[in-house]
């Protein structure tokens, strides 16, 4: 298959991956209305085309939390990334570092912190959930700090797992899940050899290091699910703020009041996110939630956004809506599944190319010039 656009990777990934893995990344919660709206609402954002502005020189670079970035894009934390390519977290991190942008390692990564951090020449970010096992949280924070992780991404929109019905249909969970996954792997021999055989171990590295024994897929569904903490409040985050001396970003903000609470708490940034439509179906898309949040807290902390971003044009739209930086999730997972590190590198090049086209045709010569002035106002 010819890859000519950033969106081409999805179809290629569906052909290459066993269904349980493709649908785990591709699916959302309940009937997946929010999942679809994330993409549709962003696609419906109209930009003002400007001409004759001498756009011969563009500057896509930016800076976030003291880190220089070649463009305002990072890779979001995605669980089980190492199941989509051999040692997938390492490959994705290398692609991000080569591009000069941050990579965020998930709590539930296959490759542990200690494997990924030394593989790249810039500090990575680390994502953490609030879990009942506070000992694990402290252990993970200590290891992230020791490995030189620069920014902590704290996910707060998962006090309980979302109802992801597609996982049960695909074999990721549900009746006879293990048998169905084996049968699917047998019909996808390229993945079975490259990842299933050569990509071992398939345990959850960060959790295994704490528990002292391998933590496989069944434990991911079991131990982690049992450890999500619905009693979480802002007060529970105070000890983490005291312990972590680097930038701290709160992921999962959709309401201006929560954004203001994050400012009061002392967060360095927030991520406007609905978990890619994987938690509560029916909530606002990130594109619709972002403008009100930007109006409430812009300038008081950094605003990042994810969910629904598939192209460089989408990046420009999110920046115009008020984001300082965006994070890619599914988009890079599809590319990783298709071609590993090279796939992610090519995706990022395509994203940059698409951004450049959008900036030239809207008259924005730098990231600072991508503002709400680029948006078509409702008449």
From Swiss-Prot:
<feature type="binding site">
    <location>
        <position position="24"/>
    </location>
    <ligand>
        <name>substrate</name>
    </ligand>
</feature>
<keyword id="KW-1003">Cell membrane</keyword>
<dbReference type="GO" id="GO:0006089">
    <property type="term" value="P:lactate metabolic process"/>
</dbReference>
<protein>
    <recommendedName>
        <fullName>L-lactate dehydrogenase</fullName>
        <ecNumber>1.1.-.-</ecNumber>
    </recommendedName>
</protein>
<feature type="binding site">
    <location>
        <position position="251"/>
    </location>
    <ligand>
        <name>FMN</name>
    </ligand>
</feature>
<dbReference type="InterPro" id="IPR013785">
    <property type="entry name" value="Aldolase_TIM"/>
</dbReference>
<feature type="binding site">
    <location>
        <position position="127"/>
    </location>
    <ligand>
        <name>FMN</name>
    </ligand>
</feature>
<dbReference type="InterPro" id="IPR012133">
    <property type="entry name" value="Alpha-hydoxy_acid_DH_FMN"/>
</dbReference>
<dbReference type="GO" id="GO:0009060">
    <property type="term" value="P:aerobic respiration"/>
</dbReference>
<keyword id="KW-0288">FMN</keyword>
<dbReference type="InterPro" id="IPR000262">
    <property type="entry name" value="FMN-dep_DH"/>
</dbReference>
<keyword id="KW-0997">Cell inner membrane</keyword>
<comment type="function">
    <text>Catalyzes the conversion of L-lactate to pyruvate. Is coupled to the respiratory chain.</text>
</comment>
<keyword id="KW-0472">Membrane</keyword>
<feature type="binding site">
    <location>
        <position position="164"/>
    </location>
    <ligand>
        <name>substrate</name>
    </ligand>
</feature>
<feature type="binding site">
    <location>
        <position position="106"/>
    </location>
    <ligand>
        <name>FMN</name>
    </ligand>
</feature>
<dbReference type="InterPro" id="IPR020920">
    <property type="entry name" value="LldD"/>
</dbReference>
<dbReference type="GO" id="GO:0005886">
    <property type="term" value="C:plasma membrane"/>
</dbReference>
<comment type="subunit">
    <text>Homotetramer.</text>
</comment>
<feature type="binding site">
    <location>
        <position position="278"/>
    </location>
    <ligand>
        <name>substrate</name>
    </ligand>
</feature>
<keyword id="KW-0285">Flavoprotein</keyword>
<feature type="domain" description="FMN hydroxy acid dehydrogenase">
    <location>
        <begin position="1"/>
        <end position="379"/>
    </location>
</feature>
<feature type="binding site">
    <location>
        <begin position="306"/>
        <end position="330"/>
    </location>
    <ligand>
        <name>FMN</name>
    </ligand>
</feature>
<dbReference type="InterPro" id="IPR008259">
    <property type="entry name" value="FMN_hydac_DH_AS"/>
</dbReference>
<dbReference type="GO" id="GO:0010181">
    <property type="term" value="F:FMN binding"/>
</dbReference>
<feature type="binding site">
    <location>
        <position position="129"/>
    </location>
    <ligand>
        <name>substrate</name>
    </ligand>
</feature>
<keyword id="KW-0560">Oxidoreductase</keyword>
<dbReference type="InterPro" id="IPR037396">
    <property type="entry name" value="FMN_HAD"/>
</dbReference>
<feature type="binding site">
    <location>
        <position position="155"/>
    </location>
    <ligand>
        <name>FMN</name>
    </ligand>
</feature>
<comment type="similarity">
    <text>Belongs to the FMN-dependent alpha-hydroxy acid dehydrogenase family.</text>
</comment>
<dbReference type="Pfam" id="PF01070">
    <property type="entry name" value="FMN_dh"/>
</dbReference>
<dbReference type="GO" id="GO:0004459">
    <property type="term" value="F:L-lactate dehydrogenase activity"/>
</dbReference>
<feature type="active site" description="Proton acceptor">
    <location>
        <position position="275"/>
    </location>
</feature>
């Amino acid at each position: 298959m010819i890859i000519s656009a950033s969106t081409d990777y999805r179809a290629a990934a569906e052909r290459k991956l066993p269904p349980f893995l493709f649908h785990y990344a591709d699916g959302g919660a309940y009937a997946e209305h929010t999942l679809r709206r994330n993409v549709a609402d962003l696609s419906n954002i109209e930009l003002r085309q400007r001409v004759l502005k001498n756009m011969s020189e563009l500057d896509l670079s930016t800076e976030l939390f003291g880190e220089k970035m070649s463009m305002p894009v990072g890779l979001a934390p995605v669980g089980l990334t190492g199941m989509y390519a051999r040692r997938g977290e390492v490959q994705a991190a290398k692609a991000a570092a080569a591009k000069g942008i941050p990579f965020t390692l998930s709590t539930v990564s296959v490759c542990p912190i200690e494997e990924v951090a030394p593989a790249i020449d810039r500090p990575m970010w680390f994502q953490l959930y609030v879990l009942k096992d506070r000992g694990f949280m402290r252990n993970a924070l200590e290891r992230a700090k020791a490995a030189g992780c620069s920014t902590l991404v704290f996910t707060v929109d998962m006090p309980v797992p979302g109802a992801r019905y597609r996982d049960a249909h695909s074999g990721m969970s549900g009746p006879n899940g293990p048998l169905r996954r084996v049968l699917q792997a047998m019909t996808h021999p390229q993945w079975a050899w490259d990842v299933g055989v050569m990509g071992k171990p398939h345990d959850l590295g960060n959790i295994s290091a704490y528990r002292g024994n391998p933590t496989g897929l069944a434990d991911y569904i079991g131990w982690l699910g049992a450890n999500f903490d619905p009693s979480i409040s802002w007060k529970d985050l105070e000890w983490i703020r005291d312990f972590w001396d680097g930038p701290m970003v709160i992921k999962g903000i959709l309401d201006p009041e929560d954004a203001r609470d994050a400012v009061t708490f002392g967060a360095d940034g927030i991520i406007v996110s609905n978990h890619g439509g994987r938690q509560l179906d029916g909530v606002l898309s990130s594109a619709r939630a972002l403008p009100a949040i930007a109006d409430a807290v812009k300038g008081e902390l950094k605003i990042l956004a994810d969910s629904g971003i598939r192209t460089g044009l989408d990046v420009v739209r999110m920046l115009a809506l008020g984001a300082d930086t965006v994070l890619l999730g599914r988009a890079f997972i599809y590319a990783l599944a298709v071609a590993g590190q090279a796939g992610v590198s090519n995706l990022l090049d395509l994203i940059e190319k698409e951004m450049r086209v959008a900036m030239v045709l809207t008259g924005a010569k730098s990231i600072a010039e991508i503002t709400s002035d680029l948006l078509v106002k409702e008449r």
